[in-house]
């Protein structure tokens, strides 16, 4: 990598293509096979370039590389096709930036799979449940409802699940995904239809998962965890697309919904950690070179690549069972407070999307249909109307895409577009994206002030670790509306619904 290249020298490799699109040209980092691209508006653009400027001044010392460098390093991986893409919520992460997606040609024997392109929280994702309740029904019992959710769902760093499960159950759940939840009575038949991959990755093989991962996962099923994970009671604030909203069962402002954001907990983290160790050895054996050690990878068809994909699929299934379990517990909490059944409250699952995953998909590449391994890290699948992999209910409106905001700010529901299939392998943003590091948030914000501000906004909050609440304060993140509007302007997704929180449950 060029030593201490000045900020102005770096700019020579960056081209602004239109109001929202930048290209990172080959040469920005060594060995780039394809160009990098990123999508921003003026405000998000400033954040990206400030990060690059600081990195140039520090002569490359410090924590993670800037997101632009990470997007470019991914463009240097073997077997990548077309481009490495940074979405508007992109920010520095481990290996891949969070909000970075890339696709690799499955027919190319050199092509790789990289755990850093999926992340440690495999299938961290979001699901949205609708209800037939109105804000006026919920406001008088908002605190009681928040407390009931907090009591029903185990939250926080070391939280243990309440879903009874032995080692055999776990192994079955890892391979069956939502089908396990359905069999055990924790999910409704309709839930499965409204999950990405129908809630089950078929290539999952529990024998590919080490005992340490299973040991970590067993007590954590049906738990929310900490960090940016949450359950929120939200209200429909704005409807941008009447038809798409009606397909989802959302027909008026003020309708109450529930959003659950969680992943594969310690289980997914261990699967990723184990794979990185195995892949470092495989890279030496197969002489695979990368620009960044954090981009440890293995050829897709190598034993290590296949083992990781099987283990990753298990972690994805774990996360779907986890969110299904929390859906069951949320339905119970609502039923208790309103003294009725979840059925009578019409607590149907609108959709469940993954934000951290690698999947084999058919895409048109150079006018040919090609099987690609699409790595989506901090990004969301967003397939258009008529795509064969989305449910019948959404065939005419496009796949729902769930975008969680930050604590106390709005969230969005988008739909996938044809342009997204062409530009970003059917992918859009996943949320707000961090603007400050967790350490900076803790230094600059007071947790009591953050909690008081939420109370002033009329948001009922229950937090297991209040002293960590600054890390998730709105100031710590980019503005989710900027992110969503940029994706809408570029045309890779379309706005359908805006949601605002009235109660937040956090780890």
Swiss-Prot record:
GO cellular component: nucleus; tRNA-splicing ligase complex
One Pfam family matching this protein: RtcB
Biological process according to GO: tRNA splicing, via endonucleolytic cleavage and ligation
Residues reported in the UniProt entry to bind Mn(2+) 1: 121, 124, 229
Oligomeric and partner information: Catalytic component of the tRNA-splicing ligase complex.
InterPro entries: RtcB, RtcB-like_sf, RtcB_euk
Gene3D superfamilies in the cross-refs: tRNA-splicing ligase RtcB
Further information: Ligation probably proceeds through 3 nucleotidyl transfer steps, with 2',3'-cyclic phosphate termini being hydrolyzed to 3'-P termini in a step that precedes 3'-P activation with GMP. In the first nucleotidyl transfer step, RTCB reacts with GTP to form a covalent RTCB-histidine-GMP intermediate with release of PPi; in the second step, the GMP moiety is transferred to the RNA 3'-P; in the third step, the 5'-OH from the opposite RNA strand attacks the activated 3'-P to form a 3',5'-phosphodiester bond and release GMP.
Enzyme Commission designation: 6.5.1.8
Residues annotated to bind Mn(2+) 2: 124, 261, 355
Annotated SUPFAM superfamilies: Hypothetical protein PH1602
GO molecular function annotation: GTP binding; metal ion binding; RNA ligase (GTP) activity
Keywords per UniProt: GTP-binding, Ligase, Manganese, Metal-binding, Nucleotide-binding, tRNA processing
Function: Catalytic subunit of the tRNA-splicing ligase complex that acts by directly joining spliced tRNA halves to mature-sized tRNAs by incorporating the precursor-derived splice junction phosphate into the mature tRNA as a canonical 3',5'-phosphodiester. May act as an RNA ligase with broad substrate specificity, and may function toward other RNAs.
Cofactor(s) required for function per UniProt: Mn(2+)
Residues given in the record as GMP binding sites: 228-232, 355-356, 404-407, 411, 430-433, 506
Location of the active site: 430 (gmp-histidine intermediate)
Domain of life of the organism encoding this protein: Eukaryota
PANTHER family linked: RNA-SPLICING LIGASE RTCB HOMOLOG
Keyword Manganese included in the entry's annotation: yes
Family matches, as HAMAP family: RtcB_euk
Broad EC category: ligase
Protein name as it appears in the record: RNA-splicing ligase RtcB homolog
Cofactor comment text: Binds 2 manganese ions per subunit.
